[in-house]
């Protein structure tokens, strides 16, 4: 709800800041313009997931012993080699896990988009969770809604199995 107020075209602080800085002359209706609405929703979804992703990555990187970094530097490894030969093999499963969580988070993100745009303008932010909700509660086609939800659930389970293979892979450095 806060973002809806911040992005409001006439009184929102985002438009006021952009005008004061001189980036725009006229107010932009971020949530009412199909050119902006989806990008704004994607950005806000990213902002919701970002702190959790940083926490996961920092925990994955804290597992790497400092001695390994020092040993690679003594051996003359460049930062690129340290990244490709030390950090990515150890943090790779966590990156894969974060990717999977991001996909699940995005597929299940109903409330943000519904509160901001309700799937509009011109269906530019009309996502699968909103379709499932509208089929069930606006059109009262519960069977179709359940079928769609089952398909999304099956897809997420299949993705979970694929990503799971990389989560539990034994890492040797």
Task: Set out the residue ranges of the language-model regions.
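A structural signal for multi-pass alpha-helical bundles of membrane permease subunits
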Residues: 1-173
């Amino acid at each position: 709800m806060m973002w809806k107020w911040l992005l409001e075209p006439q009184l929102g602080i985002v438009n006021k800041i952009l005008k004061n800085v001189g980036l725009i002359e006229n107010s932009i209706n971020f949530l009412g313009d199909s050119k902006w609405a989806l990008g704004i929703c994607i950005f806000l979804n990213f902002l919701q997931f970002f702190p959790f992703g940083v926490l996961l990555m920092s925990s994955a990187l804290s597992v790497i012993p400092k001695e390994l970094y020092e040993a690679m530097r003594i051996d003359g490894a460049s930062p690129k080699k340290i990244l490709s030969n030390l950090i990515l093999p150890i943090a790779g499963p966590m990156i894969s896990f974060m990717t999977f969580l991001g996909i699940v988070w995005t597929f299940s993100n109903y409330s943000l988009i519904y509160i901001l745009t309700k799937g509009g303008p011109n269906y530019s932010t009309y996502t699968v969770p909103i379709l499932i909700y509208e089929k069930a509660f606006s059109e009262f086609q519960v069977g179709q809604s359940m079928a769609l939800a089952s398909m999304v659930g099956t897809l997420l389970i299949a993705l979970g199995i694929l990503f799971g293979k990389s989560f539990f892979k034994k890492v040797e450095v």
